[in-house]
Amino acid sequence: MKPVKPPRINGRVPVLSAQEAVNYIPDEATLCVLGAGGGILEATTLITALADKYKQTQTPRNLSIISPTGLGDRADRGISPLAQEGLVKWALCGHWGQSPRISELAEQNKIIAYNYPQGVLTQTLRAAAAHQPGIISDIGIGTFVDPRQQGGKLNEVTKEDLIKLVEFDNKEYLYYKAIAPDIAFIRATTCDSEGYATFEDEVMYLDALVIAQAVHNNGGIVMMQVQKMVKKATLHPKSVRIPGYLVDIVVVDPDQTQLYGGAPVNRFISGDFTLDDSTKLSLPLNQRKLVARRALFEMRKGAVGNVGVGIADGIGLVAREEGCADDFILTVETGPIGGITSQGIAFGANVNTRAILDMTSQFDFYHGGGLDVCYLSFAEVDQHGNVGVHKFNGKIMGTGGFIDISATSKKIIFCGTLTAGSLKTEITDGKLNIVQEGRVKKFIRELPEITFSGKIALERGLDVRYITERAVFTLKEDGLHLIEIAPGVDLQKDILDKMDFTPVISPELKLMDERLFIDAAMGFVLPEAAH
């Protein structure tokens, strides 16, 4: 049963309290939630109202949740408040780990749970808006979303196949089914009395328009949270990102903040102010900076790259320290282009950003092979060069944009530490010292589930590196080759004994560049791109 929309009076969009708005959500509805980590574009007031209503009335029941981007704080925010038995029965997310209460329901087999690559998921919403049955893509071939593996299913109670293997002109593709949502929770900064909305205080746009179109064109209700309303037709047309006819309900929250906590809006993050070049932003010399420094060595002048969340996200600050940050462009899958990448849960809240695309268009560029290089963090690596990030130690994290980005980038740089779990290192006298070894080996013999396929990368002619604080590997047809080790570490004791398989030792094995281990600017000069 489709939800019943509140009527417009004289063209004005209905303005309701959040509590009144969620009363329009029927049982069994499919709810699509906009937002990214740290509160970016999160309609928190609507989410809270829905969670509170269910606690009090046990309605609505058996919702299906679609969340393209990981929103939350890796604890109790985001869509975690909706993790109540009976409220949610089914979920399809691009990323799961930012809202771990929902992940726990999936881990406990209490909900049906799917994971599409983040870019693919937003493209299926665009397909739903156009009344197309789904999308056909080679993104995800050879990974756990491939139906010959797990087909994107995250637990034992998830049975229906949403992804199918198809073939055109003797080439394999994946068909991803598009799910049309009934309800949207989206957010903007300002709207007029007819619902036309602008995003002036927001960090980015994500796929707000795509979600609104998908819900509207399938007879659903678009609920939009804003910080303020203004008179009809007073917003600049070039600033309007959501046309009013897509919006069915507006909820005004005058206390809406750009991110979780803090000031209502940071003008550097919204792009209104530019951070002066003299402003000192630096990382202490530790294993995180060491990995970022070595990763920077893989960059070339004029390259367009992507940087992912985690240990990889320090590369922008290292480039700024070295004075070469303007010689290449780093992008984030959620839309930002250029600038200084943020770190932590509000990843993508950049400063000095050069441009911001909608997320769906950003992924179109990635899928088409537009990236020269990408920097992604890894959880586990196996002897075939496969990488796992979406599920490990029994925890569901989801892929985010990892599969979308790594599938076609010309050079792929995986960043991480060789071991995990209480690893402590120090860098002194130009050497790396292992003060306390990590409890967990991250280089294992076989991955149970694959997020990046080494085999497919080699077939596509991609250049793959794995950079850790003590060793650098490259991927070849016969597996991982160890090509560099850190000064101060023992090859056998500190590297080979801490792996569950033995890599090929390169005959040209060398020490990592000594400049990486000095607590001063490296004097690094970005190489020219090869032609």
Swiss-Prot record:
SUPFAM superfamilies: NagB/RpiA/CoA transferase-like (SSF100950)
Any one Gene Ontology molecular-function term assigned to this protein's record: acetate CoA-transferase activity
Pfam families listed in its UniProt record: CoA_trans
Domain of life: Bacteria
Keyword line: Transferase
Any one Gene Ontology BP term: short-chain fatty acid metabolic process
Positions of the catalytic residues: 333
Enzymatic reactions: an acyl-CoA + acetate = a carboxylate + acetyl-CoA
The EC number(s) this enzyme carries: 2.8.3.8
SMART domains linked: CoA_trans (SM00882)
Quaternary context: Homotetramer; dimer of dimers.
Family of the protein in this entry: Belongs to the 3-oxoacid CoA-transferase family.
Protein purpose: CoA transferase having broad substrate specificity for short-chain acyl-CoA thioesters with the activity decreasing when the length of the carboxylic acid chain exceeds four carbons. May play a role in short-chain fatty acid metabolism in E.coli.
Other observations noted: Formation of the covalent enzyme-CoA thioester intermediate proceeds via an unstable anhydride species formed between the carboxylate group of the catalytic glutamate of the enzyme and the carbonyl carbon of the thioester linkage of the substrate.
Full protein name: Acetate CoA-transferase YdiF
The species this protein was found in: Escherichia coli (strain K12)
Phylogenetic lineage: Bacteria, Pseudomonadati, Pseudomonadota, Gammaproteobacteria, Enterobacterales
